[in-house]
Amino acid sequence: MASLIYRQLLTNSYTVELSDEIQEIGSTKSQSVTINPGPFAQTSYAPVNWGPGETNDSTVVEPVLDGPYQPTTFNPPVSYWMLLTPTDAGVEVEGTNNTNRWLATILIEPNVQSEERTYTLFGQQVQITVSNDSQTKWKLVDVSKQTQDGNFSQHRQLLSTPKLYGVMKHGGKIYTYNGETPNANTGYYSTTNYDSVNMTAYCDFYIIPLAQEAKCTEYINNGLPPIQNTRNVVPVSISSRSIVHTRAKANEDIIVSKTSLWKEMQYNRDIIIRFKFANSIVKSGGLGYKWSEVSFKPANYQYTYTRDGEEVTAHTTCSVNGVNDFNYNGGSLPTDFVISKYEVIKENSCVYIDYWDDSKAFRNMVYVRSLAANLNSVMCPGGDYSFALPVGNYPVMTGGAVSLHSAGVTLSTQFTDFVSLNSLRFRFRLSVEEPSFSIMRTRVSGLYGLPAAKPNNSQEYYEIAGRFSLISLVPSNDDYQTPIMNSVTVRQDLERQLGELRDEFNNLSQQIAMSQLIDLALLPLDMFSMFSGIKSTIDAAKSMATNVMKKFKKSNLANSVSTLTDSLSDAASSVSRSSSVRSLGSTASAWTEVSEVATEVNELTNSISTQTSTISKRLRLKEMATQTDGMNFDDISAAVLKTKIDKSTQINANTLPDIVTEASEKFIPNRTYRVIADDEVLEASTDGRFFAYKVETFEEVPFDVQKFADLVTDSPVISAIIDFKTLKNLNDNYGINKQQALNLLRSDPKVLREFINQNNPIIRNRIENLIMQCRL
């Protein structure tokens, strides 16, 4: 039997020659090279003196409320509100373009009957009739004239409790506030040469950018924050600030502090992040109507763009976390459309984008502080993916969308095909968007999120613009470079080879002929015949077998043997013959970890499904200990492994040990085992399903957990190559006699080959499904 290879590995993996150990130690010593660039790297700590810390820079961040400033005459910048804070009645502000607009604002106290008052406007004494009927609110009145010798007339008015007023030059107009607080709004006066209008303020004032107009309106209606109304806030001259807003440069390298050996550099960079999603769509075996998986996987993308006249080469890796698993089952027939699992990212998911470029900011990224980033959001809509069926209309997964919003940035290491890069990892939170997604020609519709079927929607990439800033500790001499503290490039190169080999192995599943597979599964494969397909010398094959045994020694299968060996000797005596469910705990101890039994044995709430699943996970070793003439799952697993090794073009001495060990653990994860007692069969799977039925009629009977536990201890355990559902389907559609049923129950390879040679679709579909489960 092909599974002999696993038993040989279990037996021989504990014997390692001393010379091999010495060689391995010597190899490890020679490959672990430590580079000592100085005392800081040697101790793995940064220098104690980090410099002055954060440096304030008022040219980058614009304040919302700038001031207060003393009364003055000046030309305010365009698109900035002057928020006036008068204290006494009278003229508060005036401005003119000296051509066709003279505009001033007068403050009138509450409860003033109509009377004539004298005001000084633009250097002249003017008589104006004013009034304020409100008992509590102050009144601000705009007065205007269009010629130098004309008369002033009253225009818009504002009744205000906070006693605040605003005026702004913008878009060929002069804007002011009017109405009544707390519902005041803006109005305007058209003015030529508006940008040259000088304003004279007779009270303290603040300056607020147009982008914060909503905040200015809030102050007009409700008053300034309390902190602005204390004696600690002292107005200063307008000359103390520069109104001109200086934009940050796309590339900024600023020396924060410097000593003889080290300096702190602040790197500010405008960046363009381009990324794409990758996916994996795996079709199940059978007649072509079923898919086992539609999932996301990490995607690398390399590109160039221009920043401040300089061409930048960048590399990104996009990955997702917190995916949601969905499935669709159109029925139990072989021709029913089924997707066992398809992944969707939603609000509870995260998207990570690792970014690197070839600028100085990424050269010495060992000690970093003050890392910050500001990125735009981006919407990612899903496309249409058609599931090609052999016959009939294709189901189409269509729609779905999410938006990515920046949620933070950290340091990371990004692995390309050949080198590891110090990178920035940008984390994005998600929000679902319209439209919803659906699977056309099925009942799946109205679901939200982005499915993995076609996440890029025929676009080459998505793009996000933004900026990051960090302070990095680097050598004062720019010719020096600090090394990566723990280099993992060699291991990552092996991981890359393993990743490519896994992909190749998984793609080879559809090229395996089932009749040849069964013949190969019946051969007593040993290590030499297993690896004979690899083009190498005998010495290399011997070394390869030794490396495989060393790796296999640490596998989950090998680790389970010692635990099982200790408990098997006590299994029979520890079984209680009581019919209660609780008594199963002592029997299960032979097939479960001791720690699991200790927590489960006293829990009456354990369901039958949980108990059978716990036992069935350990039945693989029980089956190995009581080998039968029937075919088992490990025979198929080893035969598939042998076939793929022979077909592979990328297998080598470095990757083979990992592949063999992974295959022993991951091939055929969903296994079903059975025991036979007279005319009754008890069957349990690793996912918790269980059946009990009669051999002749396939009629289900109640599942007796205690009986199953007893039979597991005393009787041979058989791999259910053809499980109960397949047997029942075969009997219902074709009809089988008792002898055929018994042969299939015992997994007789001759009978299996006969059904496959007859091209029986039900048996072929089951075997193909097992082959497709042989994935890494």
Swiss-Prot record:
Position of sequence motif YGL motif: 448-450
Keywords: Capsid protein, Coiled coil, Disulfide bond, Hemagglutinin, Host cell membrane, Host cytoplasm, Host cytoskeleton, Host endoplasmic reticulum, Host membrane, Host-virus interaction, Membrane, Outer capsid protein, Viral attachment to host cell, Viral penetration into host cytoplasm, Viral penetration via permeabilization of host membrane, Virion, Virus entry into host cell
Coiled-coil positions: 484-518
Spike foot as annotated region, ranges: 510-776
GO process annotations (BP): permeabilization of host organelle membrane involved in viral entry into host cell; virion attachment to host cell
Start and end residues of each stretch annotated as Spike body and stalk (antigen domain): 248-479
One Pfam family recorded for the sequence: Rota_VP4_MID
Region (Spike head) location: 65-224
Motif residue range(s): DGE motif: 308-310
Site feature (Binding to sialic acid) residues: 101, 190
InterPro entries per record: ConA-like_dom_sf, Rota_A_VP4, Rota_VP4_MID, Rota_VP4_MID_sf, VP4_concanavalin-like, VP4_helical
Region (Hydrophobic): 389-409
Family: Belongs to the rotavirus VP4 family.
Protein name, UniProt field: Outer capsid protein VP4
Source organism of this protein record: Rotavirus A (isolate RVA/Cow/Thailand/A5/1988/G8P6[1])
